[in-house]
């Protein structure tokens, strides 16, 4: 796919939990719990108008769902701030220091005073209905590992409550995650390829993690991706679970927008105007149906409504993403608005046990070939679903609607809600502006020195190749590498990195289990000059539970020979072998027992 020709633009929003002693706006510990909660409270969302009289469209959307929100908490780690029954405390200073440091890493412009804002959140994940957020800096740019990264904004905000389950119209959240400090880094739109965007996302995330001030583990980093193409629209894709999925998500969203534009062109060519809400009860057409799907609804007292979709024949079944059709988009809207599980459309019928005769009967009753079937018990819900479908159909001639979507595990996306408007942000009235003091700036400058480029250069200076240094930075082993570097000072840094990255991986492919204790034992033996680097792989391969590297070396006859003995061997071999073949011959005869550096040293001494 020619992304440049498509005019592909991609933006990232990287959210990273910070490792602090308290939550951002209260003094509760930032720990997640799996034990039985001590209490539950119930809330519902209500629309409130902003000071300018505006209402956010995403709020209207969510309130229409009539959902109930249940929040679980603990008496010893949940407070009234999280329940929105007490004003917020002043923000955590450690989180502020980290946010300012990250702003400095990306050369962003800092504000002298930080204002706490309320950002409307409509999915129930914040008890108050809003998320407290602070804009720390804007307009940053940094060149890191060869990538020119423009940063629009850096914000410090509270994380949302953790979704536990969904019970019909009730959503259950746990308050343990609510309020954990979160840094949000939003990039400028980029013209990079999807694979390059993945690299940029990793660079941003790791730039924060490398400071040691970010949480680690599953769920501590979340990526949102904004995608648009020429003629399309900005689509925000929430919750891409893994960096490796980013290229696929971007590719599939570009494909989706291309295909939605094709549908718009075809509708214009056909002269399709506005679709009106026109439904008919076609339950009688399925009185003797053999379709299990339909029969299940009818047996529970339900009915089948058919919605006319004139001019959409062959377009409802038009594939817009791998395995997803335009009809899938309509079904997403139905699922988002109502409790219905989806819909059936004429382009996929006959099918699902519905016969050609039943399809003809429905088409004859409606007087159109293109239609959608909605099945359920509640008439009001069926009519609401029909209205939602009509609204989406009437967006189709315009091309790509602006939406917030969720990433699926295969890289495709599904509709969540309309994109929020400008009315979603307003000032926090319970907190004064926060001043960035000289002390905060001074501490942030020290943290900012620990950056990705500096770490890369440091590894190169230790003798690692560029590839090995980059591989180490990208791996989860960097902290261990630095720990071992300090602990085993006689072991060459490149050998430590090679053991952690290459040798361990090669042995794992053979089915050999390698853990930290085995690696430490090998490094200790290397540090004490008991074994050679040539013997490392064989020793790790043959190490038994509870056995030390030295014990394995003695059992296998791989104990390192003393230098004086190596020198005698080199003298003996040099009398029988051509000069250029001496090193190879010694290493062949005494493989794993002699160190190549000892052989080179002995050869140099003999020659002199």
UniProtKB/Swiss-Prot annotation:
<dbReference type="InterPro" id="IPR029351">
    <property type="entry name" value="GAD_dom"/>
</dbReference>
<dbReference type="GO" id="GO:0005524">
    <property type="term" value="F:ATP binding"/>
</dbReference>
<dbReference type="InterPro" id="IPR004115">
    <property type="entry name" value="GAD-like_sf"/>
</dbReference>
<dbReference type="InterPro" id="IPR018027">
    <property type="entry name" value="Asn/Gln_amidotransferase"/>
</dbReference>
<dbReference type="InterPro" id="IPR017958">
    <property type="entry name" value="Gln-tRNA_amidoTrfase_suB_CS"/>
</dbReference>
<dbReference type="InterPro" id="IPR014746">
    <property type="entry name" value="Gln_synth/guanido_kin_cat_dom"/>
</dbReference>
<comment type="function">
    <text>Allows the formation of correctly charged Gln-tRNA(Gln) through the transamidation of misacylated Glu-tRNA(Gln) in organisms which lack glutaminyl-tRNA synthetase. The reaction takes place in the presence of glutamine and ATP through an activated gamma-phospho-Glu-tRNA(Gln). The GatDE system is specific for glutamate and does not act on aspartate.</text>
</comment>
<dbReference type="GO" id="GO:0005737">
    <property type="term" value="C:cytoplasm"/>
</dbReference>
<dbReference type="InterPro" id="IPR004414">
    <property type="entry name" value="GatE"/>
</dbReference>
<dbReference type="Pfam" id="PF02637">
    <property type="entry name" value="GatB_Yqey"/>
</dbReference>
<dbReference type="GO" id="GO:0006412">
    <property type="term" value="P:translation"/>
</dbReference>
<protein>
    <recommendedName>
        <fullName>Glutamyl-tRNA(Gln) amidotransferase subunit E</fullName>
        <ecNumber>6.3.5.-</ecNumber>
    </recommendedName>
</protein>
<dbReference type="InterPro" id="IPR017959">
    <property type="entry name" value="Asn/Gln-tRNA_amidoTrfase_suB/E"/>
</dbReference>
<dbReference type="GO" id="GO:0070681">
    <property type="term" value="P:glutaminyl-tRNAGln biosynthesis via transamidation"/>
</dbReference>
<keyword id="KW-0648">Protein biosynthesis</keyword>
<dbReference type="Pfam" id="PF02938">
    <property type="entry name" value="GAD"/>
</dbReference>
<dbReference type="GO" id="GO:0004812">
    <property type="term" value="F:aminoacyl-tRNA ligase activity"/>
</dbReference>
<keyword id="KW-0436">Ligase</keyword>
<comment type="subunit">
    <text>Heterodimer of GatD and GatE.</text>
</comment>
<dbReference type="Pfam" id="PF02934">
    <property type="entry name" value="GatB_N"/>
</dbReference>
<dbReference type="GO" id="GO:0050567">
    <property type="term" value="F:glutaminyl-tRNA synthase (glutamine-hydrolyzing) activity"/>
</dbReference>
<dbReference type="InterPro" id="IPR003789">
    <property type="entry name" value="Asn/Gln_tRNA_amidoTrase-B-like"/>
</dbReference>
<comment type="similarity">
    <text>Belongs to the GatB/GatE family. GatE subfamily.</text>
</comment>
<keyword id="KW-0547">Nucleotide-binding</keyword>
<dbReference type="InterPro" id="IPR006075">
    <property type="entry name" value="Asn/Gln-tRNA_Trfase_suB/E_cat"/>
</dbReference>
<keyword id="KW-0067">ATP-binding</keyword>
<dbReference type="InterPro" id="IPR042114">
    <property type="entry name" value="GatB_C_1"/>
</dbReference>
